[in-house]
Amino acid sequence: MRYPGGNFVSGFHWEDSVGPKALRPARTDLAWRVIETNQFGLNEFADWSKKAGSEMMMAVNLGTRGPEDAKNLLEYCNFEGGTYYSDLRKSHGYAKPHDIKLWCLGNEMDGPWQMGHKTAYE
């Protein structure tokens, strides 16, 4: 199962989807023109994937973010500890890494409807 899915990922800030729910910001989702509450986030999806017996695929925002953000997300999800983002995950109650093996780079980035879309040449 992919998280987050679809056009939504092109404006997704994963940091908004972790930590105490009361502290998560609500943001405008430009892809679907709705409010994203971030009340079901990355860690909740990881929990759900395990309960469902499915393998999690993490999608990386390539629409409005880039490689540095992808590195931070990887560190949060897969590093054991001793780094800023892996220790942040631990402080959120997840001592062990999510160990995500499947990663999706953006979503339909060649489509002109996509935030941050690129042509094949670009």
PLM ranges: what are they?
Residues N61, Q114-K118:
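Short, solvent-exposed loop/turn segments at secondary-structure boundaries
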Residues M1, S49, M58, L73, ...:
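Conserved, mostly hydrophobic/aromatic
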Residues M1-V9, V60-G81:
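Carboxylate/His-rich catalytic cores and anion/metal-binding grooves
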Residues E55:
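Residue-level detector of anion-binding/catalytic polar loops
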Residues D87-R89, K118-E122:
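Noncatalytic carbohydrate-binding groove/subsite architecture in carbohydrate-active enzymes
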Residues G41-E44, R65-N72, E122:
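Extracytoplasmic/secreted proteins, especially bacterial periplasmic and envelope-associated proteins
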Residues N7-L42, D47, G82-W113:
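Aromatic- and acidic-residue-enriched carbohydrate-binding clefts of CAZyme catalytic domains
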